[in-house]
Curated annotation (Swiss-Prot):
Positions of the record's site feature: Required for activity: 363
Protein name, per record: ATP synthase subunit alpha, chloroplastic
HAMAP family, alphabetized: ATP_synth_alpha_bact
CDD domains named among the record's database cross-references: ATP-synt_F1_alpha_C, ATP-synt_F1_alpha_N, F1-ATPase_alpha_CD
Residue numbers of Phosphothreonine PTMs: 257
Annotated EC: 7.1.2.2
Source organism (scientific name): Nasturtium officinale
GO CC list: chloroplast thylakoid membrane; proton-transporting ATP synthase complex
Catalysed reaction equations from the record: ATP + H2O + 4 H(+)(in) = ADP + phosphate + 5 H(+)(out)
Function comment: Produces ATP from ADP in the presence of a proton gradient across the membrane. The alpha chain is a regulatory subunit.
Enzyme kind, highest EC tier: translocase
Ligand binding (ATP): 170-177
UniProt GO molecular function: ADP binding; ATP binding; proton-transporting ATP synthase activity, rotational mechanism
Organism ancestry: Eukaryota, Viridiplantae, Streptophyta, Embryophyta, Tracheophyta
PROSITE patterns noted in UniProt: ATPASE_ALPHA_BETA (PS00152)
Amino acid sequence: MVTIRADEISNIIRERIEQYNREVTIVNTGTVLQVGDGIARIYGLDEVMAGELVEFEEGTIGIALNLESNNVGVVLMGDGLMIQEGSSVKATGKIAQIPVSEAYLGRVINALANPIDGRGKISASESRLIESPAPGIISRRSVYEPLQTGLIAIDSMIPIGRGQRELIIGDRQTGKTAVATDTILNQQGQNVICVYVAIGQKASSVAQVVTSLQERGAMEYTIVVAETADAPAALQYLAPYTGAALAEYFMYREQHTLIIYDDLSKQAQAYRQMSLLLRRPPGREAYPGDVFYLHSRLLERAAKLSSQLGEGSMTALPIVETQSGDVSAYIPTNVISITDGQIFLSADLFNAGIRPAINVGISVSRVGSAAQIKAMKQVAGKLKLELAQFAELEAFAQFSSDLDKATQNQLARGQRLRELLKQSQSAPLTVEEQVMTIYTGTNGYLDGLEIGQVRKFLVQLRTYLKTNKPQFQEIISSTKTLTPEAESVLKEGIQEQLERFLLQ
């Protein structure tokens, strides 16, 4: 028979008592009252913060947006099909944040910064809040460096600077996304990180943009944030802020970034859907009262940082879609008043074969020539003036048959200048090529050519100057000025190419 030793038993009990560790955690919980349409009403969650993340029993995450006296309105960041009435919800104590790192370059992610391109996880050691405060007045400096888009019409007459916010506005199918993607392609070798945010787009359109960027080697310096049309409204609403957080990460590390929001009309619609389902009072066009704040707090995050903060920059190109050219609708007027200028794309010009279909008359950049190199300023002033005069004359000439020679010449010059602004998609031009093209047009070298020959001649001229007069490009890129020497080289090249072209 086994003898029971009391001292052994007391030792074991003592050890167990010493090892016992009583941990008490306080969790803020609640109960689901109602769920549907991407919204859940929760009873409880007494100490939840506005914008705090909450976790449902089956793993779905939501954001507490409405804090009412007897319940909390939560928007779901998932379909929420498994959430049941009466199930428990716990507050996480966190505000929405995403991991950030260099490893995101070249990847396609969703609004929660999870990869959706099937190329595995992305490792990141740091994280940033999705909603961060914008830099203050002291943290900024005025915009002074150009951000070249590669499109002559924009870089010469509506210049964009690093740290500027320039709205791209127009009807559907007028080439808004094409202007934005061409700008991304033109940043190759410019040391600019690009972020393209697709909000509520068709998955096929996003795939097309990604393929186009991959084929031209632009994905190396680009991050694509995509929430397609079938995504929950909460994720479509968050996507632009996720893109801004990623761009900010690079901006505060003394780098230049470009962010494109395609498009903010769809984000406003997603936010309107969420607000109406949360029973917030509707305002103009049924948008909630704070839809201006929705966009202003996003676009104010674009900045040119001061020298103390490393002179990084974030340039924003928000896109807004208009309905049959109505620029005075609610969202377009809001975003126009927040941004530093707008590029207006016209369906009529697009259908008339003028592409990019930029209406130069009502497009404007409020930064202006501060964001241009000296060489471009030297040639662009004359171009702007001549095109404005041409637009007036053209309207007048429709009513008059017998025009004097000077007017006919001015009309002919204007038509050739308009031809010179046309560009194929995905064919951005360097600033040297643009200066040379504008100089050729404004100094009358194209006047002797048929309108149909202008683009062919300009393509040949660019090739000719690149191979036979490389010093022109060297002078412009080193001095940023159209020096008398560069001008004489250019004149010589144009004359030689004109003679060759007319002999063909």
